[in-house]
Amino acid sequence: MPLHHLMIGTWTPPGAIFTVEFDDENLTLKLVKRTEIPHDEPISWMSFDHAKKNIYGAAMKKWSSFAVRSPTDIVHEASHPMNHDPKASSPDTNTRAIFLLAAKQPPYAVYANPFYSHAGFGSVFSVSDTGKLETNIQNYPYQPNTGIHGMVFDPTETYLYSADLTANKLWTHRKLPSGEVELLGSVDAPDPGDHPRWVAMHPTGQYLYALMEAGNRLCEYVIDPATHMPVYTHHSFPLIPPGIPARDRETGKGLYRADVVALTSSGKYMFASSRANRFDLQGYVAAFKLRDCGSIERQICLNPTPTSGGHSNAVSPCDWSDEWMAITDDQEGWLEMYRWKDEFLHRVARVRIPEPGFGMNAIWYD
């Protein structure tokens, strides 16, 4: 089929879900639907359920749920407050719903992370028979200064790995039959200045990849088969060009921050991105070749992106082929499509959607 649909959310109000059509023969992108959702619940990170019948959203002060009947028929069904801490839902705090992960195996629970202040807990939601977010069944503790920004399951969905950006560590939990989780342990990031933001896992379950936001690097971990804890291999790869000025001369603040890491559908390649903190600078996207066991064989490229990426620059490989990868930015509001062919990355299409806060992560519907 030459036509594919992607859904994208926004960082700021008004809330909306944008459906974009990609034609892989004519190499075009076009906006086909803007679905209005609750005004104050823009979705900065969205995820499909296992069947792509529901979208779950990290929506400012809420966790939201939408039935997906077709690419252009998306219906809001539920919004749940952040109940892990009484202060989190207050309009006077900066606590924000930042990430969620939908289980692919029964009981299909959804795992949600707040960020900024009062973010020391993760939340687990059960779902209805149709996949709607239903009940907050667990609020499990990390630590008071935690700020989880990304999580991933191992292939068996027995172990959950969390990237704690603010506490600078990786956490490991075991999933119970109920969908709730219990703590196994945590490991500090290799460097005090790393701040892990995102994690991805190889299909073998043997290797974990941690993207370090402040460290602007990708660190490789092997999973200890006895403890299921990640062990740093001392292999890391740059997500901004080595030697580039990385800090503002006047303020000392970082000029770049790494964003997202994701594997291609075959598990043979992996993409990772970084953003710039000034609009006059560019972000970067890297590609890696993975060995069959999951270790990183080599870094293939580190290409500049057209803009800084803003809050985004999120890479989103399609889930049926290694050929297509989408990147979103919210500096200018672009969705761009890249082709990965013969280990070269080139842009084949782009569409600009000049709406407030567009665009956050893109998810592939078909």
Annotate each PLM feature.
Residues 2-4, 51-53, 105-108, 156-158, ...:
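Short coil/turn segments that connect the beta-strands within blades of beta-propeller domains
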Residues 47, 101, 152, 200, ...:
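Conserved beta-strand position repeated across blades of beta-propeller domains
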Residues 73-154:
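Asp-box/WD-like beta-propeller blade repeats and closely related beta-sheet repeat scaffolds
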Residues 30-107, 300-302, 306:
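Blade-loop segments of beta-propeller domains
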Residues 19-28, 65-74, 124-133, 173-180, ...:
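Short loop/turn segments immediately following beta-strands, especially the blade-tip
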Residues 35-40, 80-84, 89-92, 139-145, ...:
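Surface loop/turn motifs at the tips and blade-to-blade linkers of beta-strand repeat domains
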Residues 253-327:
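Loop/turn-rich, solvent-exposed surfaces of beta-rich toroidal or solenoidal domains
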Residues 8-12, 57-60, 112-117, 162-165, ...:
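Conserved beta-strand positions in repeat-built beta-propeller and related beta-rich domains
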